Curated annotation (Swiss-Prot):
GO terms for cellular component: cytosol. NCBIfam families: proB (TIGR01027). Catalyzes the transfer of a phosphate group to glutamate to form L-glutamate 5-phosphate. It catalyses: L-glutamate + ATP = L-glutamyl 5-phosphate + ADP. This is Glutamate 5-kinase 2. It holds the Pfam family AA_kinase. The keyword S-adenosyl-L-methionine does not apply. Substrate binds at S57, D144, N156. The keyword Coiled coil does not apply.
Length: 269
């Protein structure tokens, strides 16, 4: 039986934006008009009483255009430098776009400890909820500038899922460059069917996931499946949807293609 879901019913929404959505590959700049459409969607949700946290990738991708990227991209120091340079531009772009809707952005850069250490988790929760109460829009990213192997989260899909768990969000939206979860890789199998709902992450579901081939992306569908496990176990619905077109949140609400991960029923606090 198909699960009916109204996005407007979600009180607290975490939206993760992939780097491929933020970066214009032709100009090596930020997709400003697309970002404006996203922040317009965010403003609409806030106006009707919902709360929104943004988790955005893109700092490394943007910064790498400054440090003359791919030849040495895999070297940690170059990636860290790119993150430092790109984060400034990324935050500024969000700030300017949200400001046009009368909204204030608040930047948070996090490491693994902020999400898994009990004391740090409590602090992360308190800060995020306080910013939301103040009417700000939290903009979260991993702190790639200082992260090491032992402190890295690894990808923003799981980071967003942990954020959703920590603040007890009702909905996690992963905006990507694909419509949802397909039974096979649609790049090689264009006619493969897409799942509209996932009620349990089985071995068969895990086998459908592929790793990202994009040099700027950390996870691909594998990390999204892992994010789904975190969200579903926390009682949070997760949606994977294509965010490449304008007004991606409105597109979901209008019935655009997406895959819904149905959460495990549990008491929310």
């Amino acid at each position: 039986m198909e699960d009916k879901f109204d996005l407007s019913s979600a009180r607290l929404v975490v939206v993760k934006i992939g780097s491929t959505l933020v970066l214009d590959r032709e100009t090596s700049g930020i997709r400003s008009s697309w970002l404006e459409s996203l922040t317009e969607d965010v403003s609409r949700l806030l106006t009707r009483g919902q709360q929104v946290v943004l988790v955005s990738s893109g700092a490394v991708a943007i910064g790498s255009t400054i440090v003359d990227r791919l030849a040495t991209y895999s070297q940690v120091s170059h990636k860290q430098a790119a993150a430092a340079l790109g984060q400034v531009q990324l935050t500024h772009a969000y700030s300017e776009s949200l400001k046009r809707h009368g909204l204030q952005v608040a930047q948070l850069l996090m490491g693994r400890g902020d999400l898994v250490d009990p004391a740090h988790r409590l602090n992360t929760r308190a800060v995020l909820l306080r910013l939301i109460d103040l009417g700000a829009v939290p903009l979260v990213n991993e702190n790639d500038t200082t992260a090491t192997c032992g402190t890295r989260v690894g990808d923003n899909d799981r980071l967003a899922a942990w954020i959703a768990e920590i603040i007890n969000a009702d909905l996690l939206i992963l905006l990507s460059n694909v419509d949802g979860l397909f039974m096979k890789d649609p790049r090689n199998n264009p006619l493969t069917p897409m799942l509209t709902e996932v009620e349990s992450i089985t071995r068969e579901i895990e086998a459908m996931a592929t790793q990202s081939v994009d040099p700027y992306s950390s996870g691909g569908m594998i990390s999204k499946i892992e994010a789904g496990k975190i969200a579903m176990n926390a009682g949070c619905r997760m949606i994977i949807a294509n965010g490449t077109r304008s007004h991606p949140l409105y597109a979901i609400e209008s019935g655009g293609p997406s895959t819904h991960f149905i959460p495990v029923a549990r008491d929310r606090v």
